[in-house]
Amino acid sequence: MPELPEVEVTRRGIAPFVAGRRVERVDVRTAMLRWPVPAGLAEQLRAREVLAVERRGKYLLFEVDAGWFIVHLGMTGTLRVLPAGGVPVAAKHDHIDWIFDEFVLRFRDPRRFGAVLWHSREAGDVHAHPLLASLGVEPFSPAFDGALLHRRTRGRTVSVKQALLAGDIVVGVGNIYASESLFRAGIRPTTAAGKVSLPRYERLAEAVRATLADAIDRGGSTLRDFVGSNGESGYFQLDCFVYDRAGEPCRVCGTPIRQIVQGQRSTYFCPTCQR
């Protein structure tokens, strides 16, 4: 599933093409993704200029004068920029095309767990949309620090890894990045969130930012379907310290990496480096 780094890589790849350009038309070939595609989307966007492309958590927000169209990549979704002169014939899983003068922005999603939604300007600020309003803080924002993690986890018995994944404290720390961040911070993923000290949470906040920044620099992680807007795979997974390395020696101390299951998700950690 594309997480924050993959979505940010997509945003950075798309924004230079679409910002300041007008949508000539929208071809919607699939009316139902995770939720119904708004029936009037094509008409709403025709001849509209894209003013900006932002990201909130794992959602992409495309602003036009009348509102925002919101895209979520789901588990297998991608957005590709294709030159107008050489656009391949739409395949089975190519659900929506936004057609500009010199290129096409194509949404592909084999499993159809992604979403394309509309939020009108009359409905208010897009960040108040029901899917966005309850999200945690952005990991690169000044609001995210060890004090926030410490304060929001007091009294919580859930594991620190599951607290990171929940998304109500901080957004975008998916399964890969939670395991990697906890390794960098030296925290065992099974530790109760409410028992982690403030100094350790300060290290974890820095580790989360560093891990996500490294992943963005490497084009994200490609485990199955993800490619960036240019069709290239990410390669962060090749440099992971612990993720998907069960039984292999720790890159720091040589201890075999362990794999456990937490909340039906695989967790990887070093029993020596992480306490």
Swiss-Prot record:
InterPro entries: DNA_glyclase/AP_lyase_DNA-bd, DNA_glyclase_Znf_dom_DNA_BS, Formamido-pyr_DNA_Glyclase, FPG_cat, MutM-like_N-ter, Ribosomal_uS13-like_H2TH, Znf_DNA_glyclase/AP_lyase, Znf_FPG/IleRS. SUPFAM superfamilies: Glucocorticoid receptor-like (DNA-binding domain), N-terminal domain of MutM-like DNA repair proteins, S13-like H2TH domain. Belongs to the FPG family. HAMAP family: Fapy_DNA_glycosyl. SMART domains: Fapy_DNA_glyco, H2TH. Involved in base excision repair of DNA damaged by oxidation or by mutagenic agents. Acts as a DNA glycosylase that recognizes and removes damaged bases. Has a preference for oxidized purines, such as 7,8-dihydro-8-oxoguanine (8-oxoG). Has AP (apurinic/apyrimidinic) lyase activity and introduces nicks in the DNA strand. Cleaves the DNA backbone by beta-delta elimination to generate a single-strand break at the site of the removed base with both 3'- and 5'-phosphates. Its cofactor is Zn(2+). The gene is mutM. The active site is at residues 2-3, 58, 265. DNA binds at residues 93, 111, 156. Monomer. A zinc finger (FPG-type) spans 241-275. Pfam families: Fapy_DNA_glyco (PF01149), H2TH (PF06831), zf-FPG_IleRS (PF06827). One of its GO terms (biological process) is base-excision repair. Keywords: DNA damage, DNA repair, DNA-binding, Glycosidase, Hydrolase, Lyase, Metal-binding, Multifunctional enzyme, Zinc, Zinc-finger. GO terms for molecular function: 8-oxo-7,8-dihydroguanine DNA N-glycosylase activity; class I DNA-(apurinic or apyrimidinic site) endonuclease activity; damaged DNA binding; zinc ion binding. Binds 1 zinc ion per subunit. This is Formamidopyrimidine-DNA glycosylase. Its EC number is 3.2.2.23, 4.2.99.18. It catalyses: Hydrolysis of DNA containing ring-opened 7-methylguanine residues, releasing 2,6-diamino-4-hydroxy-5-(N-methyl)formamidopyrimidine; 2'-deoxyribonucleotide-(2'-deoxyribose 5'-phosphate)-2'-deoxyribonucleotide-DNA = a 3'-end 2'-deoxyribonucleotide-(2,3-dehydro-2,3-deoxyribose 5'-phosphate)-DNA + a 5'-end 5'-phospho-2'-deoxyribonucleoside-DNA + H(+).
